From Swiss-Prot:
The gene is fyna. This is Tyrosine-protein kinase fyna. Inhibited by phosphorylation of Tyr-531 by leukocyte common antigen and activated by dephosphorylation of this site. Relatively inactive in the unfertilized oocyte, undergoes rapid activation immediately following fertilization. Total activity increases progressively during later development and remains elevated during sphere and epiboly stage. The keyword Transferase applies. Changing K299M: Loss of activity. It comes from Danio rerio. GO terms for biological process: adherens junction maintenance; cell differentiation; cell surface receptor protein tyrosine kinase signaling pathway; convergent extension involved in gastrulation; gastrulation with mouth forming second; myelination; regulation of cytosolic calcium ion concentration; T cell receptor signaling pathway. Pfam families: PK_Tyr_Ser-Thr, SH2, SH3_1.
Amino acid sequence: MGCVQCKDKEATKLTDERETSVSQHAGYRYGSDPTPQHYPSFGVTAIPNYNNFHAPVSQGVTVFGGVNSSSHSGTLRSRGGTGVTLFVALYDYEARSEDDLSFRKGEKFQILNSTEGDWWEARSLTTGGTGYIPSNYVAPVDSIQAEDWYFGKLGRKDAERQLLSNGNPRGTFLIRESETTKGAYSLSIQDWDETKGDHVKHYKIRKLDNGGYYITTRAQFETLQQLVHHYSARAAGLCCRLIVPCHKGMPRLADLSVKTKDVWEIPRESLQLIKRLGNGQFGEVWMGTWNGNTKVAVKTLKPGTMSPESFLEEAQIMKKLRHDKLVQLYAVVSEEPIYIVTEYMSKGSLLDFLKDGEGRGLKLPNLVDMAAQVAAGMAYIERMNYIHRDLRSANILVGDSLVCKIADFGLARLIEDNEYTARQGAKFPIKWTAPEAALYGRFTIKSDVWSFGILLTELVTKGRVPYPGMNNREVLEQVERGYRMPCPQDCPSSLHELMLQCWKRDPEERPTFEYLQAFLEDYFTATEPQYQPGDNL
């Protein structure tokens, strides 16, 4: 059961979601992590009318909630000929420029213009102020999207991560779109027992033909709100009653502000470098602020590292890549020294985190989960037909609650330093690089898979340099002869077997990132269900 070959190589075969029904505590699933919901891209001039339950779908677009959810699609029409659909703030927001609007959670808005996609022009009914607001900070009044417990397109694994973090009590819950059943939802609840300790149970919420909802046919409800109210009063067959909605973190913004959405080359003087976080071969990383009010990370590149023109061209692509497991590129200063402005990650690089930070004490479940997050981000890069080229723990950043995000994707191609471009030069990361890429420059998503296998060794050894005791030349020679790193101390053989799959000589025989994500997310259920923590892992 544990061997990698026994599993189908393509995760697409693993499509039924593990959910628990009240009457049947069985059922197994795997669904790949969908591209997250945090960045609705509308490109429509009319806002769907969420309050008209029977409005025909005129645009074929559901701004919130996805297919057949309670986001009632249709063009914006006046109710009774006068009013408009009102939106409510889900979070506090502080204006970052003179064009956007500060507001508090619960404030209501009239939307004036939604053509900007990520930013909507709105009028606050509380203050009367007009300006741009981030569209993922608001939801239609009285919709399920406005409920604290509704998390939209959140994958099963991410639901578990959120419920099991921050010391949530038993009965903490959320509702999300089902990954596998169109129009259905999943109720995820944190539970506890003496055998498993803290864990999460998932229940499928099915939809009736007449529009109602049920977990078990014995109890049917017109709305999800009624369902939540019912199970908050009594468990009624669930593992426990619903106690408190899971804390919903602030959504990430796609841009620094509405002003930088299209013009994201920013003046150097708008950035303040506050604290140096790291120093690498090609520059430094700083924690800083933009406009004096927005915390960012700033990567400064040494002059001559890459051509500003080539960088700007690549940055146009990087800016379009949006996924929860990728560090978001916000803006650039393209004149030398080049500045790259991204979201700030509080715990720094995964390498430093494992070697010198809180990561030193992590056990295998956390480490495998971090690997699964990286695989999820790389699966998105795979779907977008992009390549990272320099995947290693130094280029993974860690945030609160052990969130991992991939940084520096695509930049390696642009480096013009001779010690790097020679590929066997001192600055080139030979130990992480697939042989066909190191020897012949054949960089593909499959060479990224090789690098991911090396990153797995970094995780289980808490940041040890790969191929200990060997220099770059020896590594290249030995790997060409068929040498592969042995199983690290205390690492389960099934995980080492996965590494060996990543290090197949023929790139096409290496697994996809979609498969790697599936394998790692299900690792302790399907592969190592008997895992017991040891001294090291």
